[in-house]
Amino acid sequence: MTIKPIYQRILLKLSGEALQGKNNFGIDTNALNRIVQEIKELIKFKINIGIVIGGGNLFRGTLLAHLGIQRVVCDHMGMLATVINSLAIRNTMLHININANILSAIPLDGICELYNLDKAIDLLEKNIVVIFAAGIGNPFFTTDSAACLRGLEIGADVVLKATKVDGVFSADPKIDPDAILYDQLNYKDILKQELKIMDLTALTLAHDNHLPIRVFNINKPGALWRVVMGKKEGTLIYTPKINKVNYNI
């Protein structure tokens, strides 16, 4: 049986920590190369790929905020950290012949282009990976919110939230060995159980616009491919309008 992807256009949300690998700070080239290779496997299936990357591997605004630096300034610094990560991802992609472009929410002439929706759609339709940098360009909004916003703007079928855990659990599995890994959840379940997956702004944006989110472990080799091919992987978050997934097992 020929395996076909269940999504044709995705928004991949990578945390900055995903690029850390086993390090405590910065970019682990082994982790970066592995993630990019997995993305390349999807390109073979002509899947349109947009990426939003966090900056937590380089900068944590909450730490400086406690030292008295203004929140707005901290958020601006965080935006620049996402640009650094975006440059690293694109450069790695170009080395293995993946055509990719960076569109930044803030002007950075000479470094990357300014975000423009028409430009983004045009690139995606040409099977060029689009990396969305600098969040949404405004303070007080997380990169998770940016991922949901960009996902909606480009008409993504799903937001794939790549994390360091296998999906959404009923409790912290590091603390509670009996924690249950959920296969699928609707947004109301998440709010009712106060599960910490994304900030409320991001979740509300996705919920109100019927945008499904799948949470999975990017550190598991092949997990990204399995998610896109409809294999049982991670946790799907959906609204009642979205049918639950029938897996290609």
From Swiss-Prot:
Gene Ontology molecular-function annotations: ATP binding; UMP kinase activity
Keyword tags: ATP-binding, Cytoplasm, Kinase, Nucleotide-binding, Pyrimidine biosynthesis, Transferase
Activity regulation: Inhibited by UTP.
Residue sites binding ATP per the record: K13, L14, S15, G16, G56, R60, T163, F169, D172
Annotated compartments: Cytoplasm
Organism domain of life: Bacteria
Residues annotated as binding UMP: G55, D75, I136, G137, N138, P139, F140, F141, T142, T143
One GO BP: UDP biosynthetic process
EC number: 2.7.4.22
InterPro entries on file: AceGlu_kinase-like_sf, Asp/Glu/Uridylate_kinase, Uridylate_kinase, Uridylate_kinase_bac
Pathway field: Pyrimidine metabolism; CTP biosynthesis via de novo pathway; UDP from UMP (UMPK route): step 1/1
Catalysed conversion reaction: UMP + ATP = UDP + ADP
Enzyme class: transferase
GO cellular component, one term: cytosol
Assembly mode: Homohexamer.
Family stated for the protein in its record: Belongs to the UMP kinase family.
Function noted in UniProt: Catalyzes the reversible phosphorylation of UMP to UDP.
Name of the protein: Uridylate kinase
Organism field: Baumannia cicadellinicola subsp. Homalodisca coagulata
